[in-house]
């Protein structure tokens, strides 16, 4: 309040290696979201250093951060963040549009990602026509379609039943296995 300075993420030091599955846990207000925003290049640290694949992210401008997000990161949001007027396939294609991929390649990648998460037959449905678990799978497909080196997931199973939660975690583990076979990170 007022002149009080709050350090949301202070004295954090971590190294994450290729193929690792890492969870950031802590009490409410402990800086988890701030930490995730910094890791995801949505924010930069006010002090200290953050390196992603050897790049000093803290010194980058907004355009450079956007390029890093687009090239290296996949996001799975807790609230799905699906666009209601777009169908499932178009929702998965959104980050591929920003990546500058041609329409045919976008469509192919998005369709393949939806098949991987078991939604190949729902490609032309709107998000409102899907269950919560199916919407989460669309969010996962969107993150996977760009074949990112790093996937950041904010409580990806928080609103799901235990069976769907296990399936979602299994999908993420498979992607980690795929990513660790590549020489990108």
Predicted features along the sequence, with ranges:
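ABC family nucleotide-binding domain
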Residues: 1-182
């Amino acid at each position: 309040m007022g002149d009080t300075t709050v350090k949301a993420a202070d004295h954090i030091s971590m190294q994450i290696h290729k193929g690792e599955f890492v969870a950031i846990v802590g009490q409410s207000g402990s800086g988890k979201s701030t930490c995730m925003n910094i890791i995801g290049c949505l924010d930069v640290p006010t002090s200290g250093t953050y390196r992603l694949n050897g790049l000093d992210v803290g010194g980058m401008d907004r355009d450079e951060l956007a390029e890093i997000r687009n090239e290296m990161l996949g996001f799975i949001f807790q609230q799905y963040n699906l666009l209601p007027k777009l169908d499932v396939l178009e929702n998965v294609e959104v980050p591929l549009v920003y990546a500058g991929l041609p329409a045919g390649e976008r469509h192919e990648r998005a369709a393949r990602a939806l098949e991987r998460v078991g939604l190949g037959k729902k490609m032309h449905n709107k998000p409102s026509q899907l269950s919560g678990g199916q919407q989460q799978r669309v969010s996962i497909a969107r993150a996977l379609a760009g074949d990112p080196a790093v996937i950041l997931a904010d409580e990806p199973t928080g609103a799901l039943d235990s069976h769907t939660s296990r399936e979602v975690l299994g999908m993420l583990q498979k992607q980690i296995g795929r990513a660790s076979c590549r020489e990108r990170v």
